Amino acid sequence: MIPPEHHVVEINPIYRSGSVTRWHTYPEVPAQSLADHHGRVAQIVLFFWPNCEASLLYAALHHDCGELIVGDVPKPRKDDDPELAALLDLREAVARAEMGIDVIDHNDPRLIFADLFEAYSYVALTSHHLLGEPAWVRAIATLGEMADMLDVSQRLVDWFSR
């Protein structure tokens, strides 16, 4: 029996948010926890920008924590409905603030790149047969363009050559 002084009454919501499941609307892609996603986005950030500022790593590790409250709505749905996307962005920002998470710059192109690249890499790792679908063909083209813009094209080549 666990002594009463060791009972956990409440787990921090930042930690709990790591249990949110991604890819639930794509049954052909295995489930991924938000903690796994955040950790991999941080790994990608450090691979491409090894001397980045702490705020970018902080953003990588917390950018989707608000999904604990609003859920993980797939990007294509948000792309199809800008009004929904704006409402979800606001609700996620409020949820992150209530969790005590500092304001995150979701418009930082490095975070956008790392987030998309993590999704692409996860699908490549777990469901590579899907990479020929138009959405993933567009994604890798977009990532190539972003890598050029961010001056990390050689790092992108290095990523795939290991």
What are the functions of these language-model segments?
Residues 55-72, 115:
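His-Asp-centered metal-binding catalytic motifs of divalent-metal-dependent phosphohydrolases/nucleases
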Residues 11-37:
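Active-site flanking loop/helix segments enriched in acidic
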Residues 24-27, 32, 68-69, 91, ...:
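Metal-dependent nucleotide-binding catalytic modules
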Residues 27-56:
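Alpha-helical phosphate/pyrophosphate-handling elements in metalloenzyme active cores
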Residues 73-89:
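Post-HEXXH active-site segment of zinc metalloproteases
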Residues 62, 102-162:
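Divalent metal-dependent phosphate-bond-processing catalytic cores, especially two-metal-ion Mg2+/Mn2+ enzymes
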Residues 84-103:
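Post-HExxH zinc-binding segment in Zn-dependent metallohydrolases
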Residues 5-8, 28-32, 104-108:
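Short, solvent-exposed segments of well-ordered alpha helices
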